[in-house]
Amino acid sequence: MQAANPICCQYSGTLDFKPPSGVKDGGFVFQVNPGRSSPMSIKSLIRTIPDYPKKGIMFRDITTLFADADGLRDVIDSFAAEFQDKQIDVIVGIEARGFIIGPAVAVALGVGFVPIRKRGKLPAETIEVEYELEYGSDVIEMHTDAIKPGQRVLVMDDLIATGGTALAAIDLIEKAGGEVAGCAFIIDLPDIGGAQKIRDRGVNVFHLVEFDGD
């Protein structure tokens, strides 16, 4: 039996692609739709689980938000619209949920993504910062060659509460010679005060929704 001929498509014209404002040339980008989402629509997709991980805690579960295709797209669109004109060079995501939203927003802006991880999780040479917890301390690391001196860096995570890890990430980026252009979170818990601590460092904070009384 004779094999079927493959189907080919040819295009003889030229493609004239111009990236949206704030997006670097040559990057694959999402179409940014500013104003498409609202904080209330995003907030309604976040599930609240009481008494988790311990009694008295209201846990804000973003897995329901990420499971909704429109909701997830609204999150990425909202971040991209906010930062597309802020001359961001690279996005840094904090382990672990910063690894979910950070790369998607990086693609939307046409920039790279750098992970910040707990000690011992990165294979090459690292720099580190130790920071205080409620009981004890912890260490976060980043590859020494991940950020070039002078690069404008956007720090991303899912939620800002006490601000300890985000402040340590700022220290780590500045230690590497980067400039922290801002911090971005899906959720802010303003009563805990972490976002204000970051602002007190002179760093802008952007969030999509907030939950009071947590």
Task: List where the protein language model places each region.
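PRPP-associated nucleotide enzymes
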Residues: 1-17, 23-214
